[in-house]
Amino acid sequence: MDHEQTRKELAAAFRWAARLEYHEGVANHFSAAVSDDGQDFLINTRGMHFSRAQASRLALVTSSDRASDPVAENVDATAWILHSYIHRNVPRARCILHTHMPYTTALASLKNFEFLMLDQNACRFYDRIAYDRHYAGMALDPSEGERVASLLTDGKDILFLANHGVLVVADTIAQAFDELYYLEKAAQLQVIALSTGRELQLVDNETAALACKQWREYPEAAELHLAALMDILDIELADYIK
């Protein structure tokens, strides 16, 4: 199987992450599982700029046997460790997006910060964020992948990585990118609101929980969002599907 549609959607996610300035150099990594057990997944190759992502250029790797898989050797080491462990150990993580996008990373770098229920977008993430509060350097040891995967429990789909960035997991590419987009929007608003020094008017927990449920049940919102983004690319940068 060539997983054509998955490749196209993931390439579109890369292109839009670049357009929205979520990327950082040729670092950061997105992946999408293509096997039921999560051991086979598509991921960006080492050194690929997000703005140049193409469906055919994404690496198909098998996490059960890296040493004998030459394709896997062209994948960033930290990407390999994080994504392989999460795909294998978190069944709902069919798509994993990891970025150092500025506003979310800024909040993740505040001591003991908890994401504020400040607006409708923030309420989408009510009780869904996990926090890794200790930065221990780059994820170059397999134990780090195992540790990070263990934090994505109890329905937590977003992981704030202290002094580092954020990781989003979802069942589909459309859902994951929609989460990433609205997370950064909500984080941007929080940074702006905090910068005023004024008292914040927060949404109460009951209302935040209701809004979160409404977000989750809103019909086809994520799919429509990705389809619209792909339509734009089809007109302006159609080479992403090659």
Map each language-model feature to its residues.
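Glycine-rich flexible loops
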Residues: 1-242
